[in-house]
Amino acid sequence: MTIIVKAPAKINLVLDATAKRPDGYHDVHMVMTTVDLADRLELTELASGEIRMNAQHAYVPNDERNLAYKAAAVLKERFDIKSGVEIYLEKQIPVAAGLAGGSSDAAATLRGLNELWKLNLTLEQLAEIGSEVGSDVPFCVMGGTAIATGRGEKLEKLVSPPPCWVVLAKPTIGVSTADVYGALDLETAERPDVGAMIDAVKNQDFTAICESLGNVLESVTLPMHPEVEQIKAFMTSCGAEGVLMSGSGPTVFALTEHENRAQRLYNGLRGFCNEVYVVRLLGENH
């Protein structure tokens, strides 16, 4: 039996880190939402009991370093599943981009295996298991839009922002999330107003959403990688209503209500970014 699942990317509309935790992670306070750029996974049951990963991408590992593999291993051990699974992964989300591609693959694996192995777990139960795999996995299990706290695993559902176009641009660099958080100085970094973003989303106020975009990690990534700042400036000059780096970067996104403006951004960015996407916010369900 084979199950096909989609793994959509996420963006952070606002991201603040509030304190460093004893476990080395940071406490975060953020609003995340899903977009319709997605990886595709095919999960096929194996009688042998092994987990076999088949990622069609040079920079994506096929072993326990892959979060989808790790998710399958955690679920298999937790419920003492005898059968195995082959995970065929077709990547569309850029790698090491701040878009939670790996976390979303893990979440999609959990959702798919719940069906394949007939576990009948709720999304909440899958999200709890996902927190063992990675901080962004619980959000990716639930999808939609949410306020995240703790390491990112504590979620409060939020109405999704009004529909708009999202232009994603990833420069040809990779950024290590651990390195960015490690270099973060909470004393000097400019901190975003998370409450203002939550209010803007609840009020469905697109202008206020664009004005409230903020990411404390820009204070680290932008000085390290000037090309990220250049992309932000270019997007603003092309008339994007809101511009922000997603996660630890290096991907930058622009929000606009106008399709022709999104297309203009895409055409301009293709000149100096080989990974550019025009997508939509996914809304409540995926």
Curated annotation (Swiss-Prot):
Family stated for the protein in its record: Belongs to the GHMP kinase family. IspE subfamily.
Pathway stated in the Swiss-Prot or TrEMBL entry: Isoprenoid biosynthesis; isopentenyl diphosphate biosynthesis via DXP pathway; isopentenyl diphosphate from 1-deoxy-D-xylulose 5-phosphate: step 3/6
Entry keyword set: ATP-binding, Isoprene biosynthesis, Kinase, Nucleotide-binding, Transferase
Residue numbers binding ATP: 94-104
Keyword Signal on entry: no
Gene: ispE
GO biological process: isopentenyl diphosphate biosynthetic process, methylerythritol 4-phosphate pathway; terpenoid biosynthetic process
Matching Pfam families: GHMP_kinases_C, GHMP_kinases_N
Active site: 10, 136
Gene3D superfamilies registered for this protein in UniProt: 3.30.230.10, GHMP kinase, C-terminal domain (3.30.70.890)
Function of the protein: Catalyzes the phosphorylation of the position 2 hydroxy group of 4-diphosphocytidyl-2C-methyl-D-erythritol.
Molecular function as annotated in GO: 4-(cytidine 5'-diphospho)-2-C-methyl-D-erythritol kinase activity; ATP binding
HAMAP family reported in the protein's UniProt record: IspE (MF_00061)
Signal peptide per UniProt: none
InterPro entries tied to this protein: GHMP_kinase_C_dom, GHMP_kinase_C_sf, GHMP_kinase_N_dom, IspE, Ribosomal_Su5_D2-typ_SF, Ribsml_uS5_D2-typ_fold_subgr
Protein name: 4-diphosphocytidyl-2-C-methyl-D-erythritol kinase
Catalyses which reaction(s): 4-CDP-2-C-methyl-D-erythritol + ATP = 4-CDP-2-C-methyl-D-erythritol 2-phosphate + ADP + H(+)
EC number from the UniProt entry: 2.7.1.148
Keyword Lipid metabolism part of the UniProt annotation: no
